[in-house]
Amino acid sequence: MAEERQIPRMKTHYFEVIRKALQEKFNYKNAMQIPRIDKIVINMGIGEATADSKKPSLAAEDLGLITGQKAVVTRARNSIATFKVREGMPLGAKVTLRKDRMFEFLDRLVTIALPRVRDFRGLNPKSFDGRGNFAMGIKEHIVFPEINYDKVDQIWGMDIIVCTTAKTDDEARELLRAFNFPFRS
């Protein structure tokens, strides 16, 4: 007997509400022109990785808990003597989320994690790259509910990049605003 999968809340919200609102606002001629979130890339760069090579694998475990997907340990592409980095040395971890996992992570990020960030005044609306992609940083990975605060030996930050199919930053900003991203005014 096949197990019935539950469609993520943000995904149904996108298809039932957001698409229609964007269609009306920007007057798209084709349904494929309506912007959507393509992928979310989460990266943890571990600065202390040069001293202890086990830290990137610990970060990858935490990132796997947060996202529900196995993280990849990132390695140095070339050696940099001033930073004591050798080629192939593990430096961090990253995950690329797509489809349902992406929408589930987006829901947890907007509703749970961002409100838990200390001294949070909203996301910078200027953090777009000019092509409709949005980048943000979080200083503590413990704001996510999947991380048990008592078992954490070190707190790491992370970069979160939301890639969209929007052609302009204004379209992407409206898309993310519709997903309840708390931008500063």
UniProtKB/Swiss-Prot annotation:
Keywords: Ribonucleoprotein, Ribosomal protein, RNA-binding, rRNA-binding, tRNA-binding. It comes from the Bacteria. GO terms for cellular component: ribonucleoprotein complex; ribosome. Belongs to the universal ribosomal protein uL5 family. The lineage of its organism: Bacteria, Pseudomonadati, Pseudomonadota, Alphaproteobacteria, Hyphomicrobiales. Part of the 50S ribosomal subunit; part of the 5S rRNA/L5/L18/L25 subcomplex. Contacts the 5S rRNA and the P site tRNA. Forms a bridge to the 30S subunit in the 70S ribosome. The keyword Ribosomal protein applies. Gene3D superfamilies: 3.30.1440.10. GO terms for biological process: translation. PANTHER family: 60S RIBOSOMAL PROTEIN L11-RELATED. This is one of the proteins that bind and probably mediate the attachment of the 5S RNA into the large ribosomal subunit, where it forms part of the central protuberance. In the 70S ribosome it contacts protein S13 of the 30S subunit (bridge B1b), connecting the 2 subunits; this bridge is implicated in subunit movement. Contacts the P site tRNA; the 5S rRNA and some of its associated proteins might help stabilize positioning of ribosome-bound tRNAs. One of its GO terms (molecular function) is tRNA binding. This is Large ribosomal subunit protein uL5. Transmembrane segments: none annotated. Pfam families: Ribosomal_L5 (PF00281), Ribosomal_L5_C (PF00673). The keyword Ubl conjugation does not apply. It comes from Bartonella tribocorum (strain CIP 105476 / IBS 506). Disulfide bonds: none annotated.
